[in-house]
């Protein structure tokens, strides 16, 4: 929704280019909406966020220490696999979502930044349905199997989208109700849905790792487990902006940012498709390899 506001409402008001005035307006709007959202979240959970509503809080809590993080990461193999899988996905996701990459995709390759944002929003709306389906699938088959299954689906859809962009004229996607636009929306919808299923399974898999650590050591340390992952995740994903900006510089954008309406050169096309689809595919392959070495399936958790 915000993407539509940024690119359909705000961008035309500032001359159709990404400039300081546009970025300033975006920052102010995001801060205001984030504050309102934070207040609403606090109000929404206040009735239920009470100690008596949660199990396991009577278990002795362990403070978060660096040595504990190192020890758990060293001894907890499922956590090692999870970090490798989730972090590789995250760095690809962060890179692909950089504004400079989305600008090249929507404003240069597709050639219609406003319509591209609307199409992206349309393809994201059904994700809540996929999240519900993904959660049920993970409950039936286990988080590890759910991650593996939906990652394979992501790989297939990513490969199809790469081929799709190679064989068509991408600018046709910007033509309302064209066959290219419809195919792009459908493929993107299912890819976003599959990624949502992976994200849902990742969340439940973190809980499985906490339970595994409790069974392995007798310590209930959700903060240490989640803190270890979050610490490594933030370090790794911080390279997303560096990868995007360095890649853009390699194709000639050394002193300016890509702007909607720039010429769609071969370099722009290859780089954008590579960072949007090929890089995530490498991350998904890393996920599948990591899950091969992880033994924390549904049978193990039930046992």
Predicted stretch roles:
Residues 1, 112-114, 213-230:
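Loop-to-transmembrane helix entry/capping segments in MFS-fold secondary transporters
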Residues 124-125, 235:
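Short hydrophobic/small-residue motifs within alpha-helical transmembrane segments
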Residues 129-145:
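Helix-to-loop junctions at the C-terminal end of transmembrane segments
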Residues 2-21, 237-267:
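Transmembrane alpha-helix termini and helix-breaking/packing motifs in multi-pass membrane transporters
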Residues 145-164:
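Structural signature of the two symmetry-related core transmembrane helices
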Residues 1-113, 268-303:
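Intracellular loop-helix junctions on the cytosolic face of multi-pass helical membrane proteins
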Residues 111-120, 180:
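Juxtamembrane helix-start elements in MFS-like secondary transporters
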Residues 173-199, 205:
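Hydrophobic core of transmembrane alpha-helices in multi-pass small-molecule transporters
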